[in-house]
Every structure is written in C-alpha cells, then in structure tokens.
Regions:
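Membrane-interface interhelical connector segments
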Residues: 132-148
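Interfacial loop-to-helix junctions that mark the boundaries of transmembrane helices
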Residues: 52-63
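Short, charged cytosolic
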Residues: 1-10
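Single conserved hydrophobic/aromatic residue that forms the stacking wall/gate
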Residues: 146-157
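Cytosolic juxtamembrane amphipathic/interface segments immediately preceding
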Residues: 10-27, 98-99
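Alpha-helical transmembrane segments
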Residues: 63-71
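A structural feature that tracks compact, well-ordered secondary-structure segments
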Residues: 39, 73, 77-128
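The first (N-terminal) embedded transmembrane alpha-helix
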Residues: 29-45
Length: 158
C-alpha cells in the first residue's frame, strides 16, 4: 500500500478520535445511524434474495449481495460510523502512532455500541410493526447476526 494512503488513513483516525472527544453525542448518533442502515439493507437484501429463491437462487444471492452493498454506500454518504470501517482506519492510525491505543479502544467501543443500539432499535420497530411475520425469530437475531463476531472469527480457525 502506498505510504500516501497510510497517511490518509492515519489522518482519518486522528479526526475520528477528535470527533469522539469533542462531540461524543454526535459521534454516537453517527454510529446509531450506521446500525439503522445495516438493518434496512439486511431486510431489503433478504426480501430481494427470497423473491428469487424459488425461481433462480443464484440470481437471488447475487442481487441480495448487491442490495446489501447499498448500505455501505449510504453509510459513507452520510458520514456514519460503522464499526468494521473504524477497525481499519483506527488500526492504521495506531500503527502510524498518530493516535493512542486507548483512543482506538474508545472509538471501537462507542462505534460498536452505537451500531448495536441502531440495529436493536430498528429491529424492534420492524418486529412490532408486524413486518417480520415471525417476531420470535427476528427480535434478537438481526442485531446479533451483524454485530457479533462468530466463534470461528474469535478463535481464528476456519
């Protein structure tokens, strides 16, 4: 990776740490919004994928993946704070010694909690609105599926 790109990531890490320190409520709200968009994209992706399930499952999976990518675009366009993106940016900043590991931990924690809260709120609204059809299934599943690492990810085994 060119060093200029590393510098850009490092500067972004400094800006994220500064935003969290100076405006924690604003930063948390950005993380919640990222969680909202992830849930919206997940629901829409499932609808698109299930629409094609009986006729052409391969197209359903492809289109479902494309639709889910829209969430990432929305998150970038509104400047929301997605935990996975913060992992990349903050790690570069810490390795380049532009931010401390304590700042990295704070950004990761707040963005993770904000993403989870956003997922939880919109998932509950989705279920209480009766849109899920099976409230018991969706109540906790949506948030846990997209915010929690799997045991394989933690252990490193594949």
């Amino acid at each position: 990776m060119p060093y200029d790109d590393v510098q850009k990531f490092s500067e972004a890490a400094v800006n994220k740490a500064k935003l969290l320190k100076e405006h924690p409520g604003k930063y948390f709200l950005r993380a919640v919004m990222a969680g909202f968009f992830i849930v919206v994209a997940m629901i829409f992706s499932n609808v698109v994928g299930n629409t094609f399930q009986s006729t052409d499952p391969a197209w359903g999976k492809l289109l479902g993946g494309i639709v889910f990518a829209i969430a990432v675009l929305l998150i970038v366009f509104i400047g929301a704070e997605l935990f996975t993106g913060n992992n990349l940016v903050m790690a570069f900043g810490a390795y380049d010694k532009k931010v401390s590991w304590a700042q990295v931990g704070k950004v990761w924690l707040v963005s993770y909690i904000g993403n989870f809260v956003g997922c939880l709120i919109l998932s509950v609204i989705f279920v209480l609105a009766g849109a899920s059809g099976t409230a018991d299934y969706y109540a906790g599943f949506i948030c846990l599926l997209y915010t929690s690492p799997s045991p394989r990810d933690i252990s490193g085994s594949r």
